[in-house]
Amino acid sequence: MSREKYYITTAIAYPNGKPHIGHAYELIATDAMARFQRLNGMDVYFLTGTDEHGIKMLQSARKEGITPRELADRNTSAFRRMAEVLNSSNDDYIRTSEERHYKASQVIWQAMVANGDIYKGGYAGWYSVRDEAYYGEEETEVRADGVRYGPQGTPVEWVEEESYFFRLSAYQDKLLDLYENNPGFIMPAERRNEIVSFVKSGLKDLSISRTTFDWGIPVPGDEKHVMYVWVDALTNYITALGYPDTTDERWAYWPANAHIIGKDISRFHAVYWPAFLMSAQLPLPKRVFAHGFLFNRGEKMSKSVGNVIDPFELVERYGLDQLRYFLMREVPFGQDGSYSHEAIVNRTNADLANDLGNLAQRSLSMIAKNCEGKVPQPGAFSEADKAILDQADAALETARKAMDDQALHLALGAIFAVVAEANRYFAGQEPWALRKTDPARMGTVLYVTAEVLRRVGIMVQPFIPQSAEKLLDILAAPADKRQFADVLASPLAGGTDLPAPQPVFPRYVEADEQN
């Protein structure tokens, strides 16, 4: 039976600097979504990569006295290393400087020409190098320092040049129909409202080529023009599936189920991209989900300001799964969030070390001591036993619904509510007292606790994969019985030998406490 296909992408990162926590946040979240759907039985294709053209790359390379290609090669290797360090399960890594991508971008350009949507004209307007975007005069302001800024707070300069244009104005009604008929196309709702209002206010044709630099994909038939970065960058999502070869087996993954992006690029993904695809007569993605920004103790981070946090250092300091868990649990996905050392330590120690780690350690140590290191044979289940087992099953359904809406924090919330309840169950049943008064009942309580831990272990795999694997290993859950379908289908068998219990989640101890 062929499994349902699921295609998910991150935005491609711009490698004119080093990776920062914002890049890591998007990759971790998207990786969890990809892993979740794989465990859910889907045939998943997960893409990430780097967007290597444009004037910022050229300027950064010149500053260092190297070519843009050398800069791209060097910095992209740091982004690839980040994907490895974060344990990302991406199926492909695309670079827009690759040959396959030149071909795809030129073919989609020609398809838009064939549809009558590209023409040559002259362009004059306010351009932000940092955003790689043009802004209307009304979207800019001159501040006290005498500099004119665009809506993202970046400086803009007046640019005049010959340019090719895309007839974006012709797509206004089609786009409004798209948003109207597919309310889930842009999420969360605040982003949808912003985009609808932007499109309703009237769309101007879009300048889609430049002649002032040459680090980019040449326009077919007019080589002195290179494609404006957004035609080139957005096309990466179909390049990776073999476009323009629609007989490529990967093409079956299109249209994408979800493009996961930062909210600062929602206009490009929710307005320009569907318009380009309509023009090229290609199917549209099902969803564009724009997440919020991460603030370091409430301060916005940016490469230009220089308060950028290195994700490699965070993993080194707190542990990978601890960082993954914190970012997905603490911040409602789609909203802005803040992080600090204290917040990461509190989440790690309270949820992972105390609630989940401690429960596993206590219950499995009791089994090792009192049940010959084997899963106990349970007796008849009491109401309390059934209630906690049922809550674990219900959490899977809640998590599935939450993940359909990219609500990672709600999925984790439901799973960790089971962990909290399992701790109350364990404390209330007092298996250490039952050891003397009712050893058979003690065995049932320990069985139920271990079985709840197995179900939780399966459900947390997308979020904290290495730790979940350790937990499932010490519960002797067979390696081929760890899909979501196994939560109910493959309960622990009484009499199974368990390995010696190992701590799964160490507490975070401050350096000065260790000395």
From Swiss-Prot:
CDD domains: Anticodon_Ia_Met (cd07957), MetRS_core (cd00814). It catalyses: tRNA(Met) + L-methionine + ATP = L-methionyl-tRNA(Met) + AMP + diphosphate. Its main location: cytoplasm. Keywords: Aminoacyl-tRNA synthetase, ATP-binding, Cytoplasm, Ligase, Nucleotide-binding, Protein biosynthesis. GO terms for biological process: methionyl-tRNA aminoacylation. A motif ('KMSKS' region) lies at residues 300-304. Its EC number is 6.1.1.10. GO terms for molecular function: ATP binding; methionine-tRNA ligase activity. It is found in: Cytoplasm. A motif ('HIGH' region) lies at residues 13-23. ATP binds at residue 303. SUPFAM superfamilies: Anticodon-binding domain of a subclass of class I aminoacyl-tRNA synthetases, Nucleotidylyl transferase. HAMAP family: Met_tRNA_synth_type2. Monomer. Is required not only for elongation of protein synthesis but also for the initiation of all mRNA translation through initiator tRNA(fMet) aminoacylation. This is Methionine--tRNA ligase. The lineage of its organism: Bacteria, Pseudomonadati, Pseudomonadota, Alphaproteobacteria, Hyphomicrobiales. The gene is metG.
